[in-house]
Amino acid sequence: MADAITYADLRFVKVPLKNSASNHLGQDCEAYEDGELTYENVQVSPVPGGPPGLASPALADKAGVGSEQPTATWSSVNSSALRQIPRCPTVCLQYFLLGLLVSCLMLGVAVICLGVRYLQVSRQFQEGTRIWEATNSSLQQQLREKISQLGQKEVELQKARKELISSQDTLQEKQRTHEDAEQQLQACQAERAKTKENLKTEEERRRDLDQRLTSTRETLRRFFSDSSDTCCPCGWIPYQERCFYISHTLGSLEESQKYCTSLSSKLAAFDEPSKYYYEVSLPSGLEELLDRSKSYWIQMSKKWRQDSDSQSRHCVRIKTYYQKWERTISKCAELHPCICESEAFRFPDGINLN
């Protein structure tokens, strides 16, 4: 009771199913690579031990092959396909290697180009670095110079500020001095106005004094008959620009001299007549006022001064003798009144009483 067995040999081929076997075998590697997977029934030789010539009717119907088509046709087609299939991977490998070689060449060319470009860029970078260093050095030098200049400018600025502050202080001091001067000027102007008022007042007083002086001069004119422009103190007797004063106080010669000195005068001296040295010529106004009963101390004459002995032991006084006044010698310690003499003085500003 053995059953019949049909064997199917399945082969997977990336070839589109064509009606013509020649078209299938003539496709290039690209069609081979881009095809779809299909299944194809292949006639195999019968298995040993099995009944020859047996085949499944279903398989024969699927293959679409008539019973009258010989089996040898499938065998030849299968053999030709099997011979053509191994050639496609070799061609692809060659193309792959060729593409890989081209890629390597292109990569090498790119590497060389990149190397050349790198060298160019490196040289440019070095050149740029040198230029940058030179520029940086120049800029640093310029910066140092600018910093030095700025330092000098700062010193000059500080000096200028100090000078400005000093000038401002000087200006303020000058302004204060100017203000003080203005205040002093105002004070001087006020003082000037006040002085003008005082001067005006003094002028009025001077005119009043002139009037009073004129009145006084007219009053004094009554008491003086001398026509000279000199005068003597009140109580003194004027005579030829001299003033005489009669003292009624008794005293020695020395005391009389001191008394006359206290009156800013001296003992009177009278000229001697040419005939008699003892005679005395007295002014008429003075002689009338003398007391004839008394003697008066006077200054020693020139002739009597020549005798030093008589000067040291005796002094001169005058007295009346037979109605005339004569000089006589007496002891200096005797007590007698005296006659003082002084220079007459002029009126102020040369004013004459006449």
Curated annotation (Swiss-Prot):
Membrane topology designation: Single-pass type II membrane protein
Modifications made to the protein after synthesis: Phosphorylated upon engagement of the B-cell receptor, probably by LYN or SYK. Phosphorylation at Tyr-7 is important for interaction with PTPN6/SHP-1.
Tissue expr: Pre-B-cells and B-cells but not terminally differentiated plasma cells.
Disulfide bonding pattern of the chain: 232-243, 260-340, 315-332
Compartments, record wording: Membrane
GO molecular function, one term: carbohydrate binding
Gene Ontology CC terms, in alphabetical order: plasma membrane
Sequence positions bearing Phosphotyrosine: 7, 39
Gene null: resulting phenotype: Cd72 deficiency affects the development and the functional activation of B-cells. The most prominent effects on B-cell development are visible at the transition from the immature to mature B-cell stage.
Residues carrying a glycan: 136
Keywords: Disulfide bond, Glycoprotein, Lectin, Membrane, Phosphoprotein, Receptor, Signal-anchor, Transmembrane, Transmembrane helix
Name of the protein this chain belongs to: B-cell differentiation antigen CD72
